Structures are given as structure tokens and as C-alpha cells.
């Protein structure tokens, strides 16, 4: 299917994913409504998003829509089924998709830890400077202020005496 996705959204009643796309051959904007079936407030959003994206009926239309965006839409739907407002659901999604630097990752279970690691990997890839970037500098020299007195630690002085 030759189409370009323009917008993707969700309808709560009856539950459906709505895609607005442009047909490249005719140049017309069209709307596709993909009903969400067998989805409850206990359903896994990532699994539901994968199933919808891999559905042969919708696959051609959802090629340009990221899996992460579909997961987010399903999270909105699940929040609505739990009775949360949109603001509460957005806040919950924000908490799930950001990393708290003060959080102790040793206390997380394996599934949550894998989720946090994937978020950190995405952030690293997004912030990483590559050679092709216009503001890439190979050798960065940083000057540290020497005004302050250097503090020594006990283990520094002990190891200096050994040598």
C-alpha cells in the first residue's frame, strides 16, 4: 500500500486506533479506523501494539507508525478503562518512560530493569554525537578551575607512601 501516515490517534468508545494517511497515488487524505478487540484494563500494551502492527489487514498502513507510539496509545486506552483522566494517564506514562537518577535499580525486578535499560539505551543513542553531526568535535579539552585547594583522601596518601 502506497500511503504516508499523517496522524495517529485513539477513540475510547468503541475502542479503536484511528490513522489519518495520504494515498500517494491519488494524493487524497483518508482515515482508517482499526477496532481494538479483546483489550481489557489488564492487557499488555506492548503485546497489543505488536499484534495490531503485525496484523496482515493493517500492516501496510502502520508501517510508518512506530511501535512505541502504538504502545503509548494503548496505554491511554488502558488508563481510560481503569477510569483515569487523560492527565493522570499522561503523568503515569511520563513516569514510566523517564529515568529517575535517584532510583535504586538494584531493587527492581528483571522485567522493570530491562525496561529501564532500554530507556537508557534510547537516551544514549539520541544524545550520542556521531562523526557526521555538524557540531561534532573530536578532541575536547576541558579546563578545570585550580582556584580551590585540592582535597586529599586517606587512601590517596596511604598508596603514595607504598611507592
Curated annotation (Swiss-Prot):
The keyword Transport does not apply. InterPro entries: CEP19. One of its GO terms (cellular component) is spindle pole. It is found in: Cytoplasm, Cytoskeleton, Microtubule organizing center, Centrosome, Centriole; Cytoplasm, Cytoskeleton, Spindle pole; Cytoplasm, Cytoskeleton, Cilium basal body. Its main location: cytoplasm. It comes from the Eukaryota. Interacts with CEP43; this interaction is required for its localization to the mother centriole. Interacts (via residues 121-150) with RABL2B. Interacts (via C-terminus) with CEP350; this interaction is required for its localization to the mother centriole. Belongs to the CEP19 family. This is Centrosomal protein of 19 kDa. It comes from Bos taurus (Bovine).
Amino acid at each position: 500500500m502506497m500511503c504516508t501516515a499523517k496522524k495517529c490517534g485513539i477513540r475510547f468508545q468503541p475502542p479503536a486506533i484511528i490513522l489519518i494517511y495520504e494515498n500517494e497515488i491519488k494524493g487524497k487524505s483518508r482515515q482508517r479506523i482499526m477496532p481494538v478487540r479483546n483489550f481489557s484494563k489488564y492487557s499488555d500494551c506492548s503485546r497489543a501494539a505488536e499484534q495490531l502492527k503485525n496484523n496482515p489487514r493493517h500492516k501496510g498502513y502502520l508501517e510508518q507508525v512506530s511501535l512505541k507510539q502504538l504502545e503509548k496509545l494503548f496505554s491511554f486506552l488502558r488508563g481510560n478503562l481503569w477510569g483515569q483522566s487523560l492527565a493522570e494517564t499522561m503523568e503515569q506514562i511520563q513516569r514510566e518512560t523517564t529515568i529517575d537518577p535517584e532510583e535504586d535499580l538494584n531493587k527492581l525486578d528483571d522485567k522493570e530493569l530491562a525496561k529501564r535499560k532500554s530507556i537508557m539505551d534510547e537516551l544514549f543513542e539520541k544524545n550520542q554525537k556521531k562523526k557526521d553531526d555538524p557540531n561534532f568535535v573530536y578532541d575536547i579539552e576541558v579546563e578545570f578551575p585550580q582556584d580551590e585547594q585540592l582535597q586529599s583522601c586517606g587512601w590517596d596518601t596511604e598508596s603514595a607512601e607504598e611507592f
